[in-house]
Amino acid sequence: MISSDVIIIGGGAAGMFAAAVLAEEAPELKVLVLEKGAKPLAKVRVSGGGRCNLTHECSDIRTFVQNYPRGGAELNGPFHRFGPTETVEWFEAHGVPLVTLDDGCLFPKTDTSEDVINALLHTAGRGNVEIRTNTECCKIWKFDGGFNVKLASGEQLACKKLLIATGGGAFIEGLGHTIEPCVPSLFTFKTSDKEFTALAGIVVEDVRVSVSGLKAEGALLITHGGVSGPAVLRLSSFGARILAETNYRFEMKINWLPAQSEEQVFQTLEKFRAVSPRKQVGTWSPVGLSSRLWKLLIARAGVDETREWGACPLKALRHIAAQVCGFVLPITGKNPHREEFVTCGGIRLKEVNFQTLESRLVPGLYFAGEVLDIDALTGGFNLQAAWTTGYLAAQSIAVG
């Protein structure tokens, strides 16, 4: 016997946004949200340090999707239908005015995620939506006309349409879909190089980091345990699966001056040697790097920092240029980025119709949010994917 028109598994951002949209667009539908945790929207509550980086400003969707290592191409169309602009309009229309920071991140003007949560719960509460917490699903199967959902408690539910909006869950594989393995994405790197970490606090605004053919550029921060910063986070995200295969033990190459070739750096050093032959190599960096970092690089090049420039043979200058453009750092592990625990993995994207977010394999089955093999570089982009897929799945269910 059908107990609900729609069951949504997962009371996170995507699931609750879908419930809120269904409450407004199809109030006649009986919607049941099943949440494994004690409260819905737990990750939204702590995102952005409790402030909730709701989305990111967007002037061009084609540029926006470049922030998604997996799923960017598939989200291009959906973002044109319900993207950052529409998200801002929706939340502001539901009592959550937003403010844009200098870095493009959008937060509630009140600086608290509770306003986002209250807006979603209040909107869902105006419709025919029931939310059950501490409720774990363990099995799903299709029958003619709907789906059966078996709970860990032994209870069985039935619905006409099913939206899965939760990450993980062995029950998904029973529906015939391919699950891409989940591995961490968006993390910083640890290193065993104590001389390097002794430089903690140094920021270099523009570097290129590379591993196994992958490259990323941006700022890099040396930390007490390793490296962080936009360049590292981008590399960790786009290289998530490759780095997982190494068990997070690999060598990362750092080019401290990506705007110049190694030959250009060498020529700069050669000119400085000609102009300032009596200066000691360690007292000044001709290429604009900080003194502490410069001293490490010349030491790794095998050059004594007290040596005068004029006494350095061309071979020594070549070695210094090689360190500037190809410093090798041993990586021995990873750390999560701040409070964000992003993973890649989930339903294989080609098995989903991104016009409707309906399964291409099982009619009446929809996906949104973390269950999809989509991830982004920062929390605001990840939440935008949740809002967009949740909204479009709900719209499709409402009109279907």
Give, region by region, the residue ranges found by the protein language model.
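A conserved short coil-to-beta-strand element within the FAD-binding core of flavoproteins
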Residues: 133-147
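Beta1/beta-strand and adjacent pyrophosphate-binding region of the FAD-binding site
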Residues: 1-14, 32
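Residue-level recognition of phosphate/Mg2+-coordinating polar/acidic sites
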Residues: 24-25, 39, 60-62, 80, ...
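Glycine-rich loop(s) and the adjacent beta-strand/alpha-helix scaffold that form part
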Residues: 161-197
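An active-site-proximal "capping" alpha-helix that borders the catalytic cofactor pocket
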Residues: 8, 18, 171-175, 384-400
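Glycine-rich FAD pyrophosphate-binding loop
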Residues: 7, 23-49
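A conserved beta-strand/loop capping segment in the N-terminal third of enzymes
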Residues: 45-114
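Short hydrophobic core segments
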Residues: 7-9, 34, 137, 149, ...
